[in-house]
Amino acid sequence: MSMVDEPLYPIAVLIDELKNDDIQRRLNSIKRLSIIARALGEERTRKELIPFLSENNDDDDEVLLAMAEELGGFILYVGGVEYAYVLLPPLETLSTVEETCVREKAVDSLCRIGAQMRESDLVEHFTPLAKRLSAGEWFTARVSACGIFHIAYPSAPDVLKTELRSIYGQLCQDDMPMVRRAAATNLGKFAATIESAHLKTDIMSMFEDLTQDDQDSVRLLAVEGCAALGKLLEPQDCVAHILPVIVNFSQDKSWRVRYMVANQLYELCEAVGPEPTRTDLVPAYARLLCDNEAEVRIAAAGKVTKFCRILNPELAIQHILPCVKELSSDSSQHVRSALASVIMGMAPVLGKDATIEHLLPIFLSLLKDEFPDVRLNIISKLDQVNQVIGIDLLSQSLLPAIVELAEDRHWRVRLAIIEYIPLLASQLGVGFFDEKLGALCMQWLQDKVHSIREAAANNLKRLAEEFGPEWAMQHIVPQVLEMINNPHYLYRMTILRAVSLLAPVMGSEITCSKLLPAVITASKDRVPNIKFNVAKMMQSLIPIVDQAVVENMIRPCLVELSEDPDVDVRYFANQALQSIDNVMMSS
C-alpha cells in the first residue's frame, strides 16, 4: 500500500466496520463517527456518510442508541448550522423505532439540532418532519412527534402555528394511550412557546381532554402539567382552570394520580396565591396526608416541610400538624421514615414555641422508632432543631435518647450518632461533653464494626481540634494509650490510627513524649499488619517532630522493621526511610 493511502486506511476500516456482522465492532465504529466525518471532510460527510446512516437498518438497539447520541453533536462535521438540516433524515428514522430509549435519544438530538437551526431551515425542514411524525402510521412516530413541537412552533408563520396547535390537539386525543401520555408529558414545554391568547383557549382545551382521560397513566402525567401551566397563566386564570382540576385529582380514584398530586401540590400554591391555597389546597393536602394508600402518604409526608414553608405558621399548626402527629405513628415504617427525613425542617418554619410544644414530642417518638432508618433520619438533621430551640432544651429533651442510640444495635445508627458528636460537642461545651458523652467516644473505639471504629478515631481528632490539646491530653490521650495493648490486633490497629490522627493536633512536644514511645512499642508487635502500619505512621510523624527525634527514635525503629521477615513490613519501613532521606536532602 502506498504512503499516500495510509491515512485513509483506518477510516476505510471504520467505514467497513459500520457494516460488520459483529455488534461490538459496529458499535465501536458508530462511537467514532466524528473521526470518520473529520477524515471525510464536510462535503463527503453530507453526501456520503449521512445518507449511508439514513439507510442503515441496523437491528441492534445499542448501535442505534449510540448513533442517535452521536448525531446530536454532528453539526460541526456537516459544515455548520446552515447544513444542520441534513442530519434530520437519519434521526427521523431513529425516532420511529420500537425501542423507547433509542427514540428518546433521537428526539433529544433532534431538539439539540433544532435549537441551533436557522428559522428558515426550521420552517422548511424541521416543521415538515414534526408533521410527518405526527401522521405516522406507527404510534412510535407519533410519540416522538410530541417531543419536538416546542422546537418547531416559535419560528413558524401564523398559519403554520394554527396547524401545529391543531395537530397537537389531535395527539392529545390519539387512540393510543402511549401517544396521549407523550402529549401530556410534553404539554408544559409546548405551552411555554405559545402566545397567551391561544394558551387560554387551545392549550387549556387540550389540558382538559388529558385530565379527563380514562387511563390513569395519562391523568397522572397531566398532573405534572398542572404546575407548568400554572406558572404560565395569570393567577385568576390559574384559579379558574387549574385549581379545580388539582382538587379533583387529589380525590382521584387512582392512587397513582393522588401520589402525583402529593408530589406537586406545593408548587401550585405559589401559582394560585395565598387565599385559594388556604381555602382549597390546604384541605386537599391534609386529605393526602391521611390517604388510605401508604404510597400517597409517603409522597405527602416527604413534602410536608416544603408545603408548610408556603403557609403562615398558624395555618400549618392548625391544619397540617394534627396530620403530622398521626403520621409519626403510622402503620407503615416507610411513611414514618419519609416524615423523619423532613420533619426537622419544620422547626425553623413554626418557630421556637410551636417547636417545643408540638414538634419535640414527635421528634422523641421518632427517635425511639423501632425502624432504624426512621431514627437515622432524625439524628442526621438534629442541627436544624438546635438552631431554633437552643442547646439547653435540646440536651434536656433529646440527649437521653441520643445517648441510648449511641449503643443502637444497627451500626448505621451508631455511625450517624458519631458523625453528629463533634457538632453536639461544640454546642454543648466541654463540661457537659465530659459528663455525658466522653465515655461513649472511647467505647466506640472497640466497636465490632470497622466503619464505627474508623469514625470513632476521626471523631477523637475533631474533638481534640474543638477543645484544644490541653483538654485532649487530659481526656483523650491517656485513655487511648491504655487501649494500645488490647488483645485483639484489629482494635490495636484502630488505636494506632487514632494516635496518628491526634499527633498533628497535639503538636511536637506531646507527640514526642507520649505518642511516639507508644508507637515504637507497637513496632515490636507480633502481628505484621500492626508493624507495617507503624511504619506508615512513622512516615506521617516525620514532619511533626524535630530532626533529632527522627534520627534518634524514628530511624532506628524503621531500620529494625526494614529487616523484618515479612515482605510488607520491610516494604513500608523502606518507604518511610526513603522519606527521611528525602527530607534530609531537601533541608
From Swiss-Prot:
Any one biological process term the GO annotation gives: regulation of phosphorylation
Per the record's keyword annotation, is Cytoplasm included, yes or no? yes
Q: Where in the cell is it found?
A: Cytoplasm, Cytosol; Nucleus
| Tissue expression remark | Expressed ubiquitously at stable levels. However, higher protein levels in roots and flowers (at protein level).
| Post-translational modification (record) | Ubiquitinated. CHIP-mediated ubiquitination enhances phosphatase activity after an abiotic stress such as low temperature or darkness.
Q: Which residues carry this modification: N-acetylserine?
A: S2
A single cellular component GO annotation:
plasma membrane
Instruction: Give the protein name, as stated in the record.
Output: Serine/threonine-protein phosphatase 2A 65 kDa regulatory subunit A gamma isoform
Q: What is the lineage of its organism?
A: Eukaryota, Viridiplantae, Streptophyta, Embryophyta, Tracheophyta
